[in-house]
Amino acid sequence: MMEINSEATVTLVSVVTLPILLALLTRKSSSKKRRPPGPWNLPLVGGLLHLLRSQPQVALRDLAGKYGPVMFLRTGQVDTVVISSPAAAQEVLRDKDVTFASRPSLLVSEIFCYGNLDIGFAPYGAYWRMLRKLCTVELLSTKMVRQLAPIRDGETLALVRNIEAAAGGKKPFTLATLLISCTNTFTAKAAFGQACGGELQEQFLTALDEALKFSNGFCFGDLFPSLRFIDAMTGLRSRLERLRLQLDTVFDKIVAQCESNPGDSLVNVLLRIKDQGELDFPFSSTHVKAIILDMFTGGTETTSSTTEWLMSELMRNPEVMAKVQAEVRGVFDNKSPQDHEGLLENLSYMKLVIKETLRLNPVLPLLLPHLCRETCEIGGYEIVEGTRVLINSWAMARSPEYWDDAEKFIPERFEDGTADFKGSRFEYLPFGTGRRRCPGDIFAMATLELIVARLLYYFDWSLPDGMQPGDIDMELVVGATARRKNHLQLVASPYKPISMQS
């Protein structure tokens, strides 16, 4: 989330040369009382140069090693505090949760989420609380997850068939391409139901893919709020607005079809709530679109990238692969595919593998930024109202201070059950915690577990000829999620063709 948009970087260099802006950009923060320690800041750009040396989560971890787990960094004009310890994270996300429960307004979310009407970036308040309740009770509940089981079953079996076709002749293929297609199609069918035909669905996903390309960091105006006009001058804002309009055009057609074809899709559920008019706030089709867009941005790439990281870790650790595959096959053998989802609860070791994958490869290395709503203290330091707060979950999850053999892939470390997805241990926050915790973990895990189980059951996996486990690079790139920079190439050999069970 701290990646700096390349266009913003170029613009930044240009602006630095304009002396007329010097006085504006070098204004000092009015409060220095017990401010957290931090690295040096330059006039104009603050501490942005510290983030250009390596991946942001890595650079911030290294800086925290010198300046402490509560660290101040001025990013452009924005005062930012970086949290890198479980104790400080607990203060922010539990003890003073309400104080840090809001979000800053960022250009991309402002435009694509219809003025931050989505649950991810809506400012904290009565509207957001209503939205959160609507999502947890209606859209992302255990009941809704069960209701979507037939779609999950169908799309994950389709994934297996697509892998069988791609792996013909034991040729290496790119697993990520098929995973993304599977998760996109599942989310589209869950969101839109049968009302959204193949062509309309494809138009929506194409437009969404273009939009997500802009989700890889902060825009210039996000770092220099008084200079937001720069984003308009460079044409960035107009490009984002054109993309939103393109997405909106397809979205409106889908919503219209859902309105004329009542069903149980997520859009239909929201439309019924809209028509009932029982909410405390005006609720229109625009709100419906903002919520559904969150489902795609927060769900599809999350599941596909996590699965690819998991397969990467298993290929690097053959003994873990053998153990988890034996468990899955022991449970699934001689069972109908229609029974697979009901048997997932018996795959205890596979669940540990997923947990360990999310420890080493969190979906968001830096949790979505929080906004301090009133001046308070964290770790004995004053955090001023309006400060952005970043939680470096990646750094805590890989710290030898909190984990034995922190860099090794050891699923057994979770056997004691003390770490869960709800934030029971603050050094492990794959979905965040507190009020702004991701509400879709049950929804996401149901799909992720079935995909992983079927990949392990139906195929034996190997690396391309001449490649060894140690040759797999684990370099990441941060966009909407942290995904592999170079997609994994694998060879799949059918263990038991799906046709034998169908």
Curated annotation (Swiss-Prot):
Mainly resides where? membrane
Record-linked PROSITE patterns: CYTOCHROME_P450
Residue positions binding heme: C438
Q: Name one GO biological process term.
A: cellular response to jasmonic acid stimulus
Q: What induces it?
A: By chitin oligosaccharide elicitor and jasmonic acid (MeJA).
Q: What are the names of the required cofactors? A: heme
Write down the membrane topology.
Multi-pass membrane protein
Tell me, what does this protein do in biology?
Involved in momilactone phytoalexins biosynthesis; acts as a multifunctional diterpene oxidase. Participates in the biosynthetic steps between 9-beta-pimara-7,15-diene and 3-beta-hydroxy-9-beta-pimara-7,15-dien-19,6-beta-olide. Also catalyzes consecutive oxidations at C19 of syn-stemod-13(17)-ene.
Q: Which family does it belong to?
A: Belongs to the cytochrome P450 family.
What protein name is recorded for this chain?
A: 9-beta-pimara-7,15-diene oxidase
